[in-house]
Regions:
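Non-core capping and flanking segments associated with repeat-based/extracellular domains
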Residues: 1-145
């Protein structure tokens, strides 16, 4: 199924365990991401920007998306993450490990240079990013190397 470049989703999705958008994820906006209520989210073909990611992190830090344990965005373009960590208020860096989904085949993500950030209520997440991806994983759900 091909989704038009002009497509916009302004509805609400019911809360769920997993949201998979394997292709044509360009329609997912920051507002959509802020309203999703899922434990694990994967979006491929994302067109979100660095400022969008900062906004999502601020939302998460303030207690938003409380059920989210795993977020994976794969971009349809390269993002410049050169100074990205400068805005993160990093608690710990160069974390290596693996996230394993409770459904063994849903999402596994290995990382070697993760950044740990902390929410206002003390919950921690590890962020891994590069030109083509951005991943957030709940600290309690990862296995450290």
């Amino acid at each position: 199924m091909n989704v038009s470049d002009n497509y916009r989703f302004d509805g609400n999705l019911e809360p769920g365990n997993r949201l998979l958008i394997y292709a044509y994820g360009h329609w997912v906006t920051l507002d959509n991401l802020l309203s999703f209520d899922f434990i694990e989210i994967t979006v491929r073909g994302s067109r979100l920007s660095i400022p969008d990611l900062y906004s999502f992190i601020r939302h998460w830090r303030a207690g938003g998306s409380p059920r989210l344990k795993f977020l994976r965005l794969e971009f349809d373009h390269q993002l410049d993450f050169e100074h990205f960590e400068d805005e993160l208020e990093v608690v710990e860096r160069d974390i290596a490990g693996e996230y394993r989904s409770r459904d063994d085949h849903f999402q596994n993500w290995r990382f070697d240079h993760g950044y740990c950030i902390q929410r206002n209520d003390g919950v921690k997440t590890v962020i891994d990013f590069g030109g083509g991806h951005f991943v957030m994983m709940n600290w309690s759900e990862i296995q450290l190397k």
